[in-house]
């Protein structure tokens, strides 16, 4: 199994936008591996973990092949893991060409948002480009030989 980590930071990234703390200033000065984008990973070129606002930057930097990605697992609905606004580029008629179908998996709020996009003809003229599957904690998914167990993500202090 080959896992590529594109981003390993939380919502704010490192350095955080607007932040002038010592850690952020140091990361900016050092650059390279010290600059961290929002969490995202790719497994064996076909399973994307999370779809956040840094996805386009990750694509531009790491040049992964979108046509090989068959599945996208959304760990939870916070915007640093799921940024549905960019899905309009995937399903829109003007932004992308020659794309492959991707199956998205996520909790109820992720599922509901993707279904909303799929059923909005102004956003999604071609709903065959993606499907959404709702998963619950404890569900076992089998995706082309991968076995994935859905776990509850609860890290919000509120």
Name these PLM-found stretches.
Residues 1-158:
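Binuclear metal-dependent hydrolase catalytic cores
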């Amino acid at each position: 199994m080959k896992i590529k980590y594109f981003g390993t930071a939380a919502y704010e990234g490192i350095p955080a936008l607007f932040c002038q703390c010592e850690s952020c200033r140091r990361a900016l000065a050092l650059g390279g591996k010290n600059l961290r984008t929002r969490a995202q990973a790719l497994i064996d070129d076909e399973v994307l973990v999370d779809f956040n606002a840094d996805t386009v930057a990750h694509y531009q930097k790491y040049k992964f092949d979108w046509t090989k990605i068959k599945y996208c697992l959304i760990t939870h609905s916070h915007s640093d893991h799921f940024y549905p606004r960019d899905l309009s580029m995937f399903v829109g008629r003007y932004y992308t060409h020659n794309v492959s179908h991707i199956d998205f998996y996520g909790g109820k709020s992720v599922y509901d948002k993707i279904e909303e996009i799929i059923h909005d003809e102004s956003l999604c003229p071609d709903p065959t480009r993606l499907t959404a599957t709702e998963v619950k904690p404890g569900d076992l998914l089998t995706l082309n030989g991968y076995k994935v167990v859905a776990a509850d993500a609860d890290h919000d202090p509120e």
